[in-house]
């Protein structure tokens, strides 16, 4: 009697493991969206950064119009902005407010949509604000 119960229990566990094995690969094979892939790249940039504060996605250019092949590198272009959260904090950058007058960086490169592949190739450069010299308008003192 005891042997039959143990055998039945083992059979149930085997069935559960089989079902779990069928479900897990299909879940991991789903491609990341273009935005999700970029957000993962921003997270990696924050981890590798030596700057004091985290950066957060500010603007994302439209995705390329090509196939959804997981392994293919996709070109990306986006801007990130410095947040008020220190880099040492264990908080997602998406939950941090942008820093007033924080640095803004333009990033270009490639990412993959494969959730098991965190490889990306990005180059981010700080955008410099352009200050135009203000001149007095000439028209009020126009001579006729």
From Swiss-Prot:
PROSITE patterns: CATHELICIDINS_1, CATHELICIDINS_2
Subcellular location: Secreted
PTM text: Elastase might be responsible for its maturation.
Arginine amide, modified sites: 143
Residues cleaved off as propeptide: 30-130
Molecular function GO labels: lipopolysaccharide binding
Cystine pairings recorded for this chain: 85-96, 107-124
UniProt entry keywords in alphabetical sequence: Amidation, Antibiotic, Antimicrobial, Disulfide bond, Fungicide, Secreted, Signal
Secretion signal span: 1-29
Cellular component, GO, one term: extracellular space
Membrane-spanning parts: none
Keyword Disulfide bond: yes
Alphabetical GO biological process terms: antimicrobial humoral immune response mediated by antimicrobial peptide; defense response to fungus; defense response to Gram-negative bacterium; defense response to Gram-positive bacterium; innate immune response; killing of cells of another organism
Principal location listed in the UniProt entry: secreted
Organs and tissues of expression: Large granules of neutrophils.
Physiological role: Potent microbicidal activity; active against S.aureus and E.coli.
Family per similarity comment: Belongs to the cathelicidin family.
Protein name in the entry: Cathelicidin-4
